[in-house]
Amino acid sequence: MAYRSAPLYEDVIWRTHLQPQDPTLAQAVRATIAKHREHLLEFIRLDEPAPLNAMTLAQWSSPNVLSSLLAVYSDHIYRNQPMMIRENKPLISLWAQWYIGLMVPPLMLALLTQEKALDVSPEHFHAEFHETGRVACFWVDVCEDKNATPHSPQHRMETLISQALVPVVQALEATGEINGKLIWSNTGYLINWYLTEMKQLLGEATVESLRHALFFEKTLTNGEDNPLWRTVVLRDGLLVRRTCCQRYRLPDVQQCGDCTLK
């Protein structure tokens, strides 16, 4: 059944926001982002009070709230084509691209440049949503993940996968409208792109090592399946997305420049 508009924040019980525990880490991450990718600070707030309508994953992923968010987003996407049959899979795929696309780059920058590892567990993040239903900004209660601090860049990226990304994919897959593999495919493309963006900062050797571990190893170091495995593949000497993100099925949405269907 296609999503249509409904009251957005009905029956949401707001939880007390976590108190910041490591202001020095917040300052260091903010300074690094400001120096290298200042525009990221437009949609990630570190140890700043979150607005009351910002939600943790546990809150926005509840069936009523998520259905309302997707309904509002559907109304926005189909606003100029009201008679067109609505498709939920490409809609959720694009919604997830917004969510993960705004979340992952600053977290990669934090995890791969700081001595202390940022705790990326979902309870430390509040998402503020745009009036169109997609995410607009993340408010982060900055804490150190003492277990991840001594880890290598590869292990830190695996922490990002297991703690920050898996819960998001599982929440969206629970709608029954999308296969998580599509979201992981989009996410692999994003991470590969941002590794290229970070090459000057991290060095080519580190970036290539991370690419191999993230995209060409079938399992993570803990033995679990690697959801990013072969989400990008080598074609004509370049790593490219393996599957289409499906946005071409939505009205008035710009197609990817390197769409696999071309």
From Swiss-Prot:
* Induction statement: Induced 2.4-fold by hydroxyurea.
Q: Care to name a GO molecular-function term for this sequence? A: ferric-chelate reductase activity
Subcellular location field: Cytoplasm; Cell inner membrane
Q: Which residues bind [2Fe-2S] cluster?
A: C244, C245, C256, C259
Could you say what a knockout of this gene produces?
Removal of iron from coprogen, ferrichrome and ferrioxamine B is significantly lower in mutants compared to the corresponding parental strains.
A cellular-component GO term for this protein: plasma membrane
List, separated by semicolons, the cofactors it needs.
Answer: [2Fe-2S] cluster
Read off the InterPro entries from this record: Fe_iron_reduct, FhuF_C, IucA/IucC-like_C
State how the cofactor is bound.
Answer: Binds 1 [2Fe-2S] cluster.
A biological process term (GO) from this entry: reductive iron assimilation
Q: What membrane topology is annotated for this entry? A: Peripheral membrane protein
Please state how the activity of this protein is regulated: Displays pH dependent redox properties. SufD is necessary for the stability of FhuF.
Quaternary structure annotation from Swiss-Prot or TrEMBL: Monomer.
| Record remark: domains | Globular monomeric protein mainly composed by alpha-helices sheltering internal cavities in a fold resembling the 'palm' domain found in siderophore biosynthetic enzymes.
Q: Which named protein is this?
A: Ferric siderophore reductase
